[in-house]
Amino acid sequence: MTILTQSTTWQALAAHSHQIPHMRELFAGDPARFSNMSLSTCGLFLDYSKNRATPETLNLLQTLAQEAKLDAKIKAMFAGDIINTTEKRAVLHTALRSTAEQSIVAEGQDIVPEVQQTLNKMQQFVTSVTSGQWKGFTGKAITDIVSIGIGGSFLGPKIVSQALRPYWITGLNCHFVANVDGTSISEKLKLLDPETTLFIMSSKSFGTQETLTNTLTAKAWFLAKGGSQSDVAKHFVAVTSNVAKATDFGIDADNIFPMWDWVGGRYSLWSAIGLPIALLIGMDNFRSLLKGAHQMDTHFANAPLAENMPVIMGLFSLWYGNFFNAQSHVVLTYDHYLRGLPAYFQQLDMESNGKSVTLNGTHVDYSTGPVIWGGEGTNGQHAYHQLLHQGTALIPADFIMPLQSHNPIGEHHDQLASNCFGQTQALMQGRTLDEALAELSKSSLSDEEKLLIAKHKVMPGNKPSNTLLMDKLTPETLGALIALYEHRTFVQGAIWDINSFDQWGVELGKSLGNDVLARIGAEQDATALDASSNGLINLYRQGKI
């Protein structure tokens, strides 16, 4: 057993998990449960009353966090300590949304001035492009942006841009390319005019396979459509640490934005990786996005555990994963603009906490990161919600909804809200056999048929959920929401004693993929790998089954 599972508190939680009454009873016995188990901060309201929890549960979970030295680990992250131990790096995405007055030290120097300098450079660039001052090779202004990246340099900018569609004020169009499948970039290029298109290449090394391949394809298209090598600088910019490779490609050194080792890809949208966002919503709105995240950082760093929103959410996720065998967690966004958030949180959580050894290399004897999935309400109600209500797996849920719509048409938002709240009630309350029989009492079915149908209509309830509300979706509230989930992810990893900031599973896939690519291009049949891989490579080379 590990130190964590040997602890008295862990054992107490394991025993306590079998003693919690049904949530129906918890609500019936405590009229103040909603007010006692809800919290408001940073423009967000969290109702966590529909969880399998009593005051004793919360006390035990907070004790577990204290024993794991969560407070000290939070301070270590914000202080710039080397908490990404396998890569010997600080973890300071929080510095990207710091204020100019702060001082944050990494590797012996204050990094805030460089962060502010980069924001100012972004400001100048955005102004130049959106004002029409930036001209393409034929003297025309830019109309379309193509953001080329992968992972965090793709998903963050895409999802945030999508979420903030009501704040697109610059008149530009933005297209996102990530997949190395040639169809992806080909379909985008069909829509574009090389004279008015600007490409943003985002890769720390300027060598990420998918990103470089797509960028080279974009460059070939640009040159084939009338541009010259000397014109590349007018249509390509980069976010990278490898200035030499970017300039060799043809990008002007003045149009290269920095990336830092102390920012992981899945936490990078707050940096110059967010250029596509800023080009769509303007720098004032981009700074509001940063402001909302900074407010959540401040809350996370200073609020006591019992009143700390990321801590509460992280502890409940751990509670269900480790003591109720919950293998997945569903995120349900009741706002069309937020439909991409489940995919973003999926990457954030699963890439961070999909680990199986502790910081000292001991194999864990408890579950770590769950499968994160989800979708858009109310669509999911006509699909996978069936499994949530009557399936055999326990799947905790997060419901996210703004109280006010950007498009208040008729009763649309009232119906959306009623569905959201109704789903949380149904998951908690369920339907008993007696209630199902009562609903069938006036039917013409025989008593035997009524009993049979009633059994099929029973729902156990007691299915946990959180509800997150905001007044309205704005750059500021979105920033706070994303930072909330970042810190929630950190809380779990800190208690599990794993490194939430490396991704060696991703790295292995990259290296093996490169090896297979070399074998695909070889003259002789593949024979050096396992029989399955050899067979697949040879079939691919034949081009037919």
From Swiss-Prot:
PROSITE patterns according to UniProt: P_GLUCOSE_ISOMERASE_1 (PS00765), P_GLUCOSE_ISOMERASE_2 (PS00174), P_GLUCOSE_ISOMERASE_3 (PS51463)
EC number: 5.3.1.9
Record pathway: Carbohydrate biosynthesis; gluconeogenesis; Carbohydrate degradation; glycolysis; D-glyceraldehyde 3-phosphate and glycerone phosphate from D-glucose: step 2/4
Record keyword Cytoplasm present: yes
Broad EC category: isomerase
Location(s), subcellular: Cytoplasm
Subcellular location, principal: cytoplasm
Gene Ontology annotations for the cellular component aspect, listed alphabetically: cytosol
GO biological process: gluconeogenesis; glucose 6-phosphate metabolic process; glycolytic process
Keyword Endoplasmic reticulum recorded: no
Record-linked PANTHER family: GLUCOSE-6-PHOSPHATE ISOMERASE
Family: Belongs to the GPI family.
Name of the protein described by the UniProt record: Glucose-6-phosphate isomerase
Species for this entry: Shewanella sp. (strain MR-4)
Gene designation: pgi
